[in-house]
Amino acid sequence: MAKTLMIQGTASNVGKSLLTTGLCRLYSRRGLKVAPFKAQNMALNSFITPQGREVGRAQAVQAAAAGTPLRAEMNPVLLKPLGDSLSRVILLGKPWKTLRAAEYYRERPFLWSAVTGALESLAPDFDLIIVEGAGSPAEINLKADEIVNMRVARHLNAPVLLAGDIDRGGVFAFLYGTMELLEPEERALIRGFIINNFRGDPSLLRPGLEMLKNLTGGRPTVGVVPHLRDLRLAREDSLFLDEGGMGTPKPGLVDIAVLRLPGMTNYDDFDPLAAEPGVNLRFIDSPAELGPGSTLPRALILPGTETPLRALGWLRERNLAAAVAACRDLGVSVAGIGEGFRMMGSFVRGVSGEGAPESPAGQAEPPGQVDLPGQVHLPGLGLLPMEGRFDPEEGKRLLRGLTREGDEVRGYGVPGGWVPAPGDEAPSDGSAPGPMPEAGSGKAPPGAPPAPEAFLVLEGSRAGGLRSADGRVWGAALHGVFDAPGFRRRWLRSLGWTESGSPRDREELQRREFDRLADHLEAHLDMGLLDRIIGI
């Protein structure tokens, strides 16, 4: 059976995920079969297993670091926040229920059985399971119902390392205070501390480390981990934006602006663009950030979102829908990924309950279509002649396909999710399906430009994306299209980008970053002590 180690933290965003990732890499390099595990994750950034199950992106990164295939059991409960205390619950990789906080807590006994079952499934297949906690184990108002911190540690009898981020200030108070708020049997599981994200001379910490050891019954600090600069690994949700993802145009660079939609998912879709020399990637949430005509971005991107109907309302409330249309008319390329692609349609159809407005009074319904109970039908952005469809129960899966230019793309998403606008022919053969509607309104003006073509065909001959005849407006159903260097660079060249060097292999870059992180931890943790704590 597998040995276990658990990483808990004094608060959110103290580095638990990165520490878990680095340790997965470090021990897998020693020849151990390592699995990451997080009982419950709350995140909009997700990934799909080879079996088509959805898990948190952090666990996907950790599994890649460990060199093991991703499994739904590594993150049995994924909460995708929708706002207003409402979350979509993904259970063992499949959509389960949409619940409010009080409803969720009533389901904890059932969810705990899923957590323990997942651990039982993983244990025979691995030598070491590295478990990540969530937030703090000392949230005394939540402890009675938690299924992700000390309850997991007690179930596994796992040794726990408690991590604190010294860059936040007050790290010794955080560590000691957390210990004091734990029950005696919980404190007994804490075997040591990690001080993360240190900048400066570690010798200055010695008096504090000694006092912490004395105050906590001789528990050692397993390591003081210095800040690691420019680590290029996928992060959870808005942390990237909080740490500088918002920016301004930079002279001499191809400027690409991503609309920061409510419920935005898959931030790492755009990492390959940001990594290209000569590209400035930024996130915006107001028309003012687009700048006057001479400083408009070369491209706007509508990303994926867990709440697409709400995002449409948000775009209109902020006048961003009109701004996108105006930018398109001024020659700015407009692209959509996943749900962002489906929002580009003449109309969108979805299920009420995510905070979307009802269908506007007097809004014309497409001929022959009747809304089912609980559905809403709204005008889309009108950038492409299709109807986007959103179903919270829809299943995402791994997808691959070819563009018309022969570029192979791989990723994941909903293979359907859209149909040609009523009266148009299906564009699966790339033929013109009808006039392009007026951007932002859902209406098709007379004399509209030539209609789009299906530029991406998925396995099974299903169209996976549309683009306008001039190529400036396009959308793709799958996340991960920018990982394909041929497709990515072809599009960047159309924006005026000058190619510099050969395309970067994202998987190779990721492997190097995993090793850099593992080397960093190996150099700054007491590995002999850590091995003894784990029992290996």
Question: In which residue ranges do the predicted regions lie?
Answer:
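Flexible phosphate-sensing "switch/lid" loops adjacent to ATP/NTP-binding sites
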Residues: 2-326, 333, 392, 403-430, ...
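Extended, hydrophobic alpha-helical segments
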Residues: 315, 322, 328, 353-357, ...
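Catalytic nucleophile serine of serine hydrolases
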Residues: 338
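Local cysteine-cluster metal-coordination motifs and their immediate loop/turn environment
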Residues: 341
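A conserved active-site-flanking secondary-structure segment within enzyme catalytic domains
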Residues: 345-362, 371-420, 499
